[in-house]
């Protein structure tokens, strides 16, 4: 039976009505007031009154602000992420098949026309996130990719984010953050192209705006705080495990980190090491990690690796690391996670920044039914079919009978009219409303 060496504080199941009300009001204001309302919110909330649509001068200035080494690192990340996305794209196939003589059906892949990519820029400069969203959309074949990131007063968009956006292929870049940015993407403001899909992580206001707009636009996930779990057995190095937990706790004061271990000694050793690692962080990261570890961290000791799998699947963590023997066994048995990192040589930070697979992942248990951002989010998988008259003769009779069984006479008659047109001298058994067997000439 699982034993907790450390448990998170009991969750507060509060409904954030204030955030919801604020977002609803802002979306209504922007839908009515358009671009001027967006400018007003950018000015009032972010203190930014500069250009919203960024052009060549801004991109060149951002490029000049970065060292060659930084640009090379961003290019490396772009190559890995877009390369992985290209492999995903190649795994998606169109096909057609003759299901019976004269009945041909197929599957077609159609990219959405416009994607909106939100790139956060608050506590940290998320250059990698720009690549994850914009680059993946372009590999998927999206014609219009509109990217947006918060601008700071007198500074604008972080140059690393701006450079990454342009490098990844953004067709238009907006200096906007928060609800006003999401609204601009959804309503097509400053671009003339209303987004079909909006992706990218953000704060609770961004997440709520995406939730409200879902249906009008497609979204990736309603992102919550970043989560990370580590599964470790007695062979794991407690120093490495502790470093990885702290590294993810710095995301924010409400970012859960969980250790699932089959070794009590390892769990106790990790708990002992974490405080010193947190204390050594820079101020902003230290404050976030301190709160996250204190309030949201858990350390669970399991009797077996099978129980560890069960506990992990219940967490359904956004990120899941495994530092244990027989990595292939874990790969085969684990089911619920956003992205899996196998072995000590592999850490979440690699995936967060540059190794290839996307870092925009499901949170709050959504990994039970959803995966991370991929090219598939930007591609509609649609079907088509074509029948000749011989196939229509067979299918039409059965469709008419099923339609009448269901009480849908209008549906049935669309088959009737074709059968009588193509085969006027034949009689067919086309069913009766609510039953079978009647013959209609």
Feature-to-residue mapping (PLM):
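Conserved small-residue-rich beta-alpha loop and adjacent elements
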Residues: 95-163
